[in-house]
Structure formats: C-alpha cells, structure tokens
C-alpha cells in the first residue's frame, strides 16, 4: 500500500514538472516576440502628431496648447486661459 502511494506521488510530481516546463517554454516564446511588438506599437504612436495639446496635457510654451488654453509656468500643463469664443 505504501509503495503504491509513493509511486503515485512520484508520477504526479514528474507530470507536474513536465507540464510546468512546457508552459515555461510557451511563455518564453511569447516573451521573445513581445519586444518587437512593443517597438512596432511605439512607432505607430510616435508617428501620430497632434495638432495641439489638450486640457491638462504637458507643454513648454503657449503655442503648443489648443485654443483658449495656455501653458502654466509652474507645472507646465495646458489650462484654460480665461477666454471664450470660437
């Protein structure tokens, strides 16, 4: 009885190690492919240029902000400049 329990536990242990190794091999191939995917997505987002920086967006001067927004001097973000109109 004890021998059959030990054999069963040993077989389960071997199966667990085998399944874990297969999973790590799959996950490893995903990780090797992901940097190229991330770089391609980075290129896509960098190619899009916005016309102006929207409300609370980062800026360095007023001309970067959308109409009726100005660049704040302290934290350098676009905020309403107090004007109305189209």
Curated annotation (Swiss-Prot):
Modified residues (Phenylalanine amide): 84
Propeptide: 22-50
Function: Inhibits both peak current and fast inactivation of voltage-gated sodium channels (Nav) channels. Inhibits the inactivation of Nav on DRG neurons (EC(50)=1.77 uM) and peak current of cardiac myocytes (IC(50)=0.90 uM).
Tissues showing expression: Expressed by the venom gland.
Ranges in a coiled coil: none
Signal peptide (UniProt feature, chain positions): 1-21
Protein name: Mu-theraphotoxin-Cg2a 2
Keyword set, alphabetical order: Amidation, Disulfide bond, Ion channel impairing toxin, Knottin, Secreted, Signal, Toxin
Highest classification ranks of the organism: Eukaryota, Metazoa, Ecdysozoa, Arthropoda, Chelicerata
Domain notes: The presence of a 'disulfide through disulfide knot' structurally defines this protein as a knottin.
């Amino acid at each position: 009885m004890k021998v059959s329990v030990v054999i069963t536990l040993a077989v389960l242990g071997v199966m667990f190690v085998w399944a874990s190794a297969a999973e790590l091999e799959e996950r490893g191939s995903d990780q090797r492919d992901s940097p190229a995917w991330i770089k391609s997505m980075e290129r896509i987002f960098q190619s899009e240029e916005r016309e102006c920086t929207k409300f609370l967006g980062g800026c360095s001067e007023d001309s970067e902000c959308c109409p009726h927004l100005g660049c704040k001097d302290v934290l350098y973000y676009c905020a309403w400049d107090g004007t109305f109109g189209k």
